[in-house]
A protein has these predicted regions:
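ATP-dependent carboxylate-amine ligase
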Residues: 7-170
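Short-chain dehydrogenase/reductase
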Residues: 1
Length: 170
């Protein structure tokens, strides 16, 4: 988002716009649902980043969650279209949890089992919850989340995680 704002600023300046006019435009931007959309309700903060996922974006989202206030909960699902190394790439994302201070992982999906196992090995500070399906995950997640928590929800779109965000925002 920052790089997009910088690129937009450069284009605006190239076309003779005033910096104050560009600033107003940038300040009025709102993130799209599923694309690092931050939702704050009376209970907790949800980072809705479940439109798509790949190893780089997963790691970046985990880094953002690590810097968030309160108890940090990562709700992650499978990453699609990774090819023959998909299991290793999921495990690599799990290894990224080491030293991040993430309190809990709720993972669902066949490939995310690799991610959950890697978190269990690399991050003793993270409570790991693995489920085969998104529905099983939601059943355990909803009563787990408390006031003041920050919850990252991220998976490839085919996993249907917007439903998780919808349940959390009820």
């Amino acid at each position: 988002m920052v790089y997009n704002a910088l690129a937009g600023t450069a284009v605006g300046l190239a076309y003779g716009m005033e910096l104050s006019e560009i600033q107003k435009g940038i300040e009025s931007l709102q993130s799209l649902s599923g694309r690092f959309h931050i939702i704050e309700n009376e209970k907790y903060t949800i980072v809705d980043d479940c439109y798509n996922a790949n190893p780089v974006s997963m790691k970046a989202s985990i880094d953002v969650l690590a810097a968030a206030p309160g108890r940090k909960i990562a709700v992650l699902g499978d990453m699609g279209e990774l090819g023959e190394n998909e299991q290793e790439l999921h495990a690599m994302v799990g290894e990224h949890f080491e030293g991040k201070g993430i309190d809990a992982l709720f993972a669902a999906g066949a490939l995310s089992e690799n991610l959950a196992q890697a978190v269990g090995k690399c991050s003793k500070e993270t409570e790991v919850h693995y489920f085969k399906t998104k529905d099983e995950l939601m059943e355990e997640l909803l009563p787990y989340v408390k006031s003041g928590d920050t919850v990252l929800v991220k998976a490839s779109h085919f996993m249907g995680f917007p439903e998780v965000v919808g349940q959390l925002t009820k």
